[in-house]
């Protein structure tokens, strides 16, 4: 399984005693960029470097204006404490070290190569280092097995350590937890979300696949079934190796051949599958902001569901591909509270430790209540700070506390207090925390419900989730809507396009 949820920590908080086992970003098919093959030009080819604004984010210790008297007794200790449970918004570059762009003054647009795998892209299929056991970040911090601390430390770490993906320095138990504070931080077992429908093919032979694809497109006519059986039944990493072998053996670009031999949504699907997954995300974001108008739903779907590592990787690659900073593009295409929400998400500052603190959760629930339903108007900055910073396990606890205090869900409160795109963004975060499979099932349903089909949305969700959790999404879809995902695909698509979608969602061809 290759979960895709809260993701890997970009820089583990120093106050955290346990880290949730990191998850492979972008699913099975992604190979992390090689550190020696930076996607950025060398120092002789500088590019712009933006410094995060210290005024961009609300202060952690923000006080609320007067109004309705507080319905709760004052806390015996302020929140956050002197040793905060969660990392503040960064005041320096938020990129992990291996993804941080150098502080150059100018960016030089990279030259276009005929090869689909330029060395400086860092997505070469030969890349093998990175996310095996231990999930090290290049600093030797991934220790694989053997870091289980067992029972009896008194710090609530009795579960979850069997994963052994520790960071060494993060396991200090002398931080004062459980020393008469009245509550202990505890770490929950990682939520092992996700069963993919597309997995790396066994006995993979890229050379044979390249020759079979060439044979399927050579001469008169095209063997579309052969294209489906190869392209739709390989992981993204394997597809990149096939493309390289195709160009090596035939001197042709596989994507260009696919474009010349197919058309419509079938072509769009195959071309999307052949792109490196990070490039695909970048293209979807760029298309959403290109031309007149902005497709806010695409921005929400991508930025509200990815981990820090994934967002930072996309930001770096977006700069390389389009010569512009993603955050700047988002600011120019959005406005108001929605712009501030996307800016917070783009900063990629979420705590990903997996640690939960019941007292802090109750405090956060109170703050959300005071920022929304207990005042005239809404303090959106508090919603931004909590929903964009807290880890998923902590957010689940916050949501439970909020419902216990009010008798209704935070989602209902968000719908009451917000409207438009910012409401949709906050609800997307809420639903991803509570049940990510159901969130993406709703995205698939929306793409096919009503008159016509939003094929772009249908293709994007299936491509990006097929190597992550599409099996879970299928189960959620049938539970929510009473019919199988396959039956909906059958009713809304046709021909080879339909059969390719069947293959990607793990269904047998029936008609």
UniProtKB/Swiss-Prot annotation:
Region listing for Disordered, in residue ranges: 1-76, 93-123, 138-195
Entry-linked Pfam families: Annexin
GO MF term set: calcium ion binding; calcium-dependent phospholipid binding; phosphatidylserine binding
Classification via InterPro entries: Annexin, Annexin_repeat, Annexin_repeat_CS, Annexin_sf
A GO-annotated cellular component: cytoplasm
Biased composition (Gly residues): 138-149, 165-181
Family membership: Belongs to the annexin family.
PANTHER family in alphabetical order: ANNEXIN, ANNEXIN B11
Record-given protein name: Annexin B11
Organism: Drosophila melanogaster (Fruit fly)
Gene: AnxB11
């Amino acid at each position: 399984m290759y979960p895709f949820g809260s993701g890997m920590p970009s820089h583990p908080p120093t106050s955290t005693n346990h880290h949730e086992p990191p998850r492979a970003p972008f699913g099975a098919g992604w190979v992390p960029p090689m550190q020696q093959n930076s996607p950025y030009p060398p120092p002789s080819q500088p590019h712009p470097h933006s410094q995060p604004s210290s005024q961009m984010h609300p202060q952690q210790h923000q006080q609320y204006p007067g109004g309705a008297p507080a319905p709760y007794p004052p806390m015996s200790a302020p929140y956050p404490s002197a040793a905060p449970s969660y990392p503040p918004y960064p005041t320096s570059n938020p990129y992990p070290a291996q993804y941080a762009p150098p502080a150059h003054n100018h960016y030089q647009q990279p030259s276009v190569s005929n090869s689909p795998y330029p060395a400086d892209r860092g997505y070469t299929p030969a890349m093998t280092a990175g996310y095996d056991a231990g999930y090290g970040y290049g600093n030797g911090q991934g220790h694989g097995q053997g870091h289980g601390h067992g029972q009896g430390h008194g710090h609530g770490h009795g579960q979850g350590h069997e994963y052994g993906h520790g960071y060494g320095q993060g396991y200090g138990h002398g931080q004062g937890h459980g020393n008469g504070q009245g509550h202990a931080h505890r770490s929950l077992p990682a939520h092992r979300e996700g069963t993919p429908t597309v997995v790396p093919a066994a006995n993979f032979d890229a050379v044979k696949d390249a020759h079979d694809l060439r044979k399927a497109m050579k001469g008169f006519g095209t063997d579309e079934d052969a294209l489906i059986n190869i392209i739709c039944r390989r992981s993204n990493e394997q597809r990149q190796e096939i493309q390289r072998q195709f160009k090596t053996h035939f001197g042709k670009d596989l994507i260009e051949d696919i474009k010349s031999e197919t058309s419509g949504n079938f072509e769009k699907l195959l071309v999307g599958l052949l792109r490196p997954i990070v490039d695909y995300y970048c293209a979807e974001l760029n298309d959403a902001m290109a031309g007149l108008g902005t497709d806010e739903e695409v921005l929400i779907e991508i930025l509200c569901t990815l981990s820090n590592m994934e967002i930072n990787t996309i930001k770096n690659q977006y700069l390389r591909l389009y010569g512009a900073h993603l955050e700047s593009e988002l600011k120019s295409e959005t406005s108001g509270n929605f712009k501030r929400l996307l800016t917070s998400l783009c900063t990629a500052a979420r705590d990903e430790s997996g640690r939960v603190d019941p007292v802090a959760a109750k405090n956060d629930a109170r703050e959300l209540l005071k920022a929304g339903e207990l005042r005239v108007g809404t303090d959106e900055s508090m919603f931004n700070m909590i929903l964009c910073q807290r880890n998923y396990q902590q957010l689940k606890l916050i949501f439970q506390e909020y419902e216990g205090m009010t008798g209704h869900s935070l989602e209902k409160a968000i719908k009451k207090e917000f409207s438009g795109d910012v409401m949709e963004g906050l609800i997307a975060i809420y639903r991803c925390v509570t049940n990510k499979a159901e969130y993406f099932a709703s995205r698939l349903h929306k793409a096919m419900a009503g008159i016509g089909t939003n094929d772009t949305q249908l293709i994007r969700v299936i491509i990006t989730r097929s190597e992550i959790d599409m099996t879970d999404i299928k189960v959620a879809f049938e539970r929510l809507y009473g019919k199988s995902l396959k039956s909906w695909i059958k009713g809304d698509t046709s021909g080879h396009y339909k059969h390719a979608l069947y293959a990607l969602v793990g269904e047998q061809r029936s008609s």
